Amino acid sequence: MKMEMGLVFLTVFMAVMSSTMVSAQSSCTNALISMSPCLNYITGNSTSPNQQCCNQLSRVVQSSPDCLCQVLNGGGSQLGINVNQTQALGLPRACNVQTPPVSRCNTGGGGGGSTSDSPAESPNSSGPGNGSKTVPVGEGDGPPSSDGSSIKFSFPLIAFFSAVSYMAIF
C-alpha cells in the first residue's frame, strides 16, 4: 500500500513539474518566434539586420532577456534553425541595442537582470593597474567560447530517478 501511494504521489509531482517547465519553455519559444525578422541575419543569409528585427530584439531584451540565451545555447536547433553564432553575437551591436553580457547565459541567472551594464554599450573605465571589469559581447576574431561547461538536468528527471532508486531498494 505504501508503494502504491508513493507512485501516485510521484506521478502527480512529475505532472505538476512538467507542466511548469513546458509553460516556461513555451514563453521563450513565443519570444524567439517573435524574432523571426532576424532569421536572415542570424543564419548568415544577410549582412545586416532589418529595422523590424532590431525592434523585435529590443522588445525581447526588455521582456525576457533570458530567452536570448536559449539561442546562444543551441535552442535554435530545437526550432530547426542553424544559428551562426558570430552573427547572433553581433546582432545587438548591429541593432545598437543594449543586452546583458553573454557571460550571464552560463550562470544560474539565465540572462535576466539589468540591461544597463552591457559592456557593448557602456564600457567601464578603470584606473591604471586595475584592469577592465567588462566582458566583451560579440567581439573578437574567433568563435565564442567558454572556459566552463554545464550540464543541465531537469528537476523532475532527477526526482524521478531518485524515487525509482529509492523504490528499488525497498
From Swiss-Prot:
Glycosylation sites: N45, N84, N124, N130
Lineage of the organism: Eukaryota, Viridiplantae, Streptophyta, Embryophyta, Tracheophyta
Tissue expression notes: Expressed in seedlings, preferentially in the endodermis of hypocotyls and roots, as well as in anthers, sepals and flower tori.
Family: Belongs to the plant LTP family.
Keywords: Cell membrane, Disulfide bond, Glycoprotein, GPI-anchor, Lipoprotein, Membrane, Plant defense, Signal
One Gene Ontology molecular-function label: lipid binding
The keyword Cell membrane is annotated on this UniProt entry: yes
Location(s) in or outside the cell: Cell membrane
Gene disruption phenotype: Increased susceptibility to penetration of the epidermal cell wall by the non-host mildew fungal agent Blumeria graminis f. sp. hordei (Bgh). Increased salt permeability in shrunken and deformed seeds, with abnormal hair-like outgrowths.
Signal peptide (UniProt feature, chain positions): 1-24
Residue pairs linked by disulfide bridges in the UniProt entry: C28-C69, C38-C53, C54-C95, C67-C105
Propeptide residue intervals: 147-170
Name listed for the protein in its UniProt record: Non-specific lipid transfer protein GPI-anchored 5
Residue ranges, annotated region (Disordered): 105-148
Lipidation (GPI-anchor amidated serine): S146
Record PANTHER family: BIFUNCTIONAL INHIBITOR/LIPID-TRANSFER PROTEIN/SEED STORAGE 2S ALBUMIN SUPERFAMILY PROTEIN-RELATED
Any one annotated GO CC term: plasma membrane
Domain of life from the UniProt record: Eukaryota
InterPro entries in the record: Bifun_inhib/LTP/seed_sf, Bifunc_inhib/LTP/seed_store, LTSS, Plant_nsLTP
Cross-referenced Pfam families: LTP_2
Bilayer topology annotation: Lipid-anchor; GPI-anchor
Induction: Induced by Phytophthora parasitica-derived necrosis and ethylene-inducing peptide (NLPPp) and microbe-associated molecular patterns (e.g. flg22).
Function, in words: Lipid transfer protein involved in seed and ovule maturation and development, probably by regulating the fatty acids homeostasis during suberin and sporopollenin biosynthesis or deposition. Contributes to pre-invasive defense against some non-host powdery mildew pathogens by preventing the penetration of the epidermal cell wall by the fungal agents (e.g. Blumeria graminis f. sp. hordei (Bgh)).
Location (main, coarse): membrane
GO biological process assignments: defense response to fungus; lipid transport; pathogen-associated molecular pattern receptor signaling pathway; response to molecule of bacterial origin; response to molecule of oomycetes origin; response to nematode
